[in-house]
Amino acid sequence: MAPTGDAAIDAIDKFIADKKIDTSKQGWRTSVPKPELAKFDPKKSYHWKVETNVGTLKIKLLPDVAPMHVTAWIYLTNLGYFDTLKFHRVIQNFMAQGGCPLGSGTGGPAYKLPGEFKDGVSHDKAGKLSAANAGPGTDGSQFFITFKETAYLDGKHAIFGEVVEGLDTTVKELEKRGSRDGSGRTSEPLFIKKATIEVK
């Protein structure tokens, strides 16, 4: 990959190149190794742009809050990890969950991360990007985007981004196709077509 001029992104891309990760191999997503923590420029903004089949989201990543999660997110995104993955669990008035390579909620990469938490950073409104997990120390590639305030998740799920574009459009489109009964089943397939990173 050509240098981007951003030290954090270039370090992540170098790690990808050095590890010779073969994304053409079947099942590659579950064998992806843990990246090395990147050092982010505090003067820059890092965004996760997610093109779904019901619209596009732009999410500001929060390296000052969760640097390892943001490192991992840029790493997975630059690998093409999220492309074609579905939102396997969407519950109205709660959240949309995706990022499972198996599409079932049971998969992830070959590493797990501990939660990263910061005082004053809360699931206090719709549009928070947070790590889904199966308990402490099990964060991987699965994530959720909140549809409302869910402060009871604070300290259990690491917040590492916030929707800045698409909250009143794409997020609403995801929600209305979710379940009302808590099952998480969607009324039609919902998936990520393409995810990219933007730095400004």
Where are these regions (language model features)?
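Cyclophilin-like peptidyl-prolyl cis-trans isomerases
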Residues: 1-200
